[in-house]
Amino acid sequence: TPVSDAEPEERNIIRFVKNSTELSYNFTIRAASPTITSISNTLPAAGEKVTVYGTGLEETSKVTLPGSIEITTGIESDEDGEWYSFTMPSGVTTGGSIYSEGANGQAATPAYFNNADCMILNFDGSGTQGFWSWSETGSMINADDLVTDPVSGSNRGKCLQLIPERLIAAGGIMSGKPRASECWTAGNDDAADDWSRMYQYIPKETPLTEVALQFDIYVAENEPWSNCGHIQINLFNNFNFAGIGSDDDGSSNQVAFYVPYIQDGEIVPFYTEGWQTVTIPFSEFNKYATLIADKETPTFEDVVTDRNSASYRNFGIGFVNTDFTYKDVTVESNTFATHIYLDNWRVVPCKDIIISDYPEDEEETE
């Protein structure tokens, strides 16, 4: 009988019964150590639900947040061990890992929970938005295009509506359009755009498999994203938001793409329950993925150097509405007018932490 299916008083005991004689031997039986794969929302507001996904997480009974804040009540966990959830308490002021205890032992998340140390742009005063050549019908997003957090009770202040309301009101983004919308940081003259400021939190020698871009996304259930379009992320301002399959998508380019509605070879309507965190390791940006495939080990210093040596070091995220093929799925563009909201662009450590069944073997691993 699996440990989690047995009654608590019957677990971890071997009983030998013969005639009127009985011998019990106590020891611990459990599955492999639990692992963590993702967190639904790594920058939650107090009162928001947080779900941690992984394996072996059944019967999670204790959660410890950064700052040694313990939660022992109100925890829900999946009977198959694929997740546990809790409500974010007030008073969590530091970032780091979440530690949990359950039927199969301890688990820990990467140290990116509640971690805003390396914020790029949050649209509320941390980081500086840049914009130029703005027009009513143009792709450039300025400060007036920002909107108030649309999620009830979240109170995040301002956020980015990726397709500005002025473009939706005009009929949406036409099919076949690259550079449909774009949002940038201020660039060369802004100290926040020199990412060497982040070395105090993420050492320059950190491999890019252990450093990630995170941002939060909200797409309402009654208006899912599924028919077309994708997000392009530019490490600096030297690309055209031409999208997947274009010259921007070269193997030596510092770009990445996000297409959440393509899952396991199929198109699945994408929406979120409140704000959801997206984590993209820098090892998945084209240039660095190519280096890793060639058995090299790019580091965070390479990212900073590439940005600081660029003519324009603005960091940018934009929407592209062209035809493309991604993970063997071909998407044909249509008119697009879905509301997609982004917030809290940031750089975070993403090294996995594995807690062994044997304390002397405990280690962190990629």
Regions from the PLM with identified roles:
Residues T1-E136, T148-V151, G157-R166:
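Ser/Thr/Pro-rich low-complexity tracts
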Residues E7-R11, T93-G95, L208-E210, W275, ...:
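Extracellular Ig-like/FN3 beta-sandwich strand-entry sites
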Residues Y112-L121, T322-E366:
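Extracellular polysaccharide-targeting segments
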Residues F123-G125, Y199-G229, I280, W345:
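Extra-cytoplasmic beta-strand recognition segments
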Residues D144-D194:
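Short carbohydrate-recognition loop motifs
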Residues A186-L213, V268-E273, V304-S311:
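Extracellular/lumenal carbohydrate-interaction signature centered on repeated Trp-anchored short motifs
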Residues Q214-F215, Q232-F236, T277-H339, W345:
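Extracellular beta-strand ligand-recognition surfaces/modules
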Residues D216-I292:
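Extracellular ligand-binding interfaces
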